[in-house]
UniProtKB/Swiss-Prot annotation:
One family name in Pfam for this protein: Ependymin
Protein name: Mammalian ependymin-related protein 1
Tissue expression as described in the entry: Detected in brain (at protein level).
Post-translational modification: N-glycosylated; the glycan contains mannose-6-phosphate moieties.
InterPro entries to which the protein is assigned, alphabetical: Ependymin (IPR001299)
Species assigned in the record: Rattus norvegicus
Gene: Epdr1
Coiled coil (residue ranges): none
Function description: Binds anionic lipids and gangliosides at acidic pH.
Length: 224
């Protein structure tokens, strides 16, 4: 969330890394490495910050967030962004600490905190080594384009993928991840404004209100 277990089990619009998924991967024994001329999976950055737009079929909505990703220490922080006034919409901060097996959900306005066990083990945001190379192409137009590579969990020429990952050919930055179930896109995440490193490691430290955290996940609407 590849056989790695389901990679990112997404249970809510902000949980790309459980949130998964933080993540929904089902890579079931992918094919052997390609021929000598076939590109090999690159190594995605271990620590970066950026933004994401997440579309989830279950809600039919896009959600935006700031992301701090620390693969070295197996932790992720996601901060909801407000791009429009949505009545009865609560914004949260999510701190996922996989080494501790716990996620903190903090309401931005009140600092109310929920502490929730993480059921899935850490699974990095990267290209699994047994992925299938699909294509390489440029995004944008003349003078303003970037080369990317597309990978999937497709096993043979006749099978269908359940995961598609797009990463830059240079530096291996994540661009987009898409998860498919029963021929339908269930989750799609676009990454942008990616910068290497973590400016402030304290973003992974829960606020003091989490010392008395509630054990249940808070809802995204106005009701508790």
């Amino acid at each position: 969330m590849l056989t790695r277990a389901p990679r990112r089990l997404v249970q809510g619009p902000r949980e790309t890394w459980l949130l998964g998924g933080l993540w929904v991967w089902i890579l079931c024994g992918l094919g052997m490495a390609g021929s000598p001329g076939t590109p090999q999976p690159c190594q995605a950055p271990q620590q970066w910050e950026g933004r994401q737009v997440l579309y989830q079929q279950s809600s039919g909505h896009n959600s935006r967030a700031l992301v701090s990703y620390d693969g070295l220490n197996q932790r992720v922080r996601v901060l909801d962004e407000r791009k429009a006034l949505i009545p009865c919409k609560r914004l949260f901060e999510y701190i996922l600490l996989y080494k501790d097996g716990v996620m903190f959900q903090i309401e931005q306005a009140t600092k109310l905190c929920a502490k929730i066990p993480l059921a899935e083990p850490w699974d990095p945001l990267d290209i699994p080594q047994n992925s299938t190379f699909e294509d390489q192409y440029s995004i944008g137009g003349p003078q303003e384009q970037i080369m990317v590579q597309e990978w999937s969990d497709r096993r043979t020429a006749r099978s269908y993928e359940t995961w598609i990952g797009v990463y830059t050919a240079k530096d291996c930055y994540p661009v987009q991840e898409t998860f498919i179930r029963n021929y339908t896109v269930v989750l799609s995440t676009r990454f942008f404004d990616v910068q290497l490193g973590i400016k402030d490691p304290s973003v992974f430290t829960p606020p003091s209100t989490c010392q008395t955290a509630q054990p249940e996940k808070m809802k995204e609407n106005c009701s508790l």
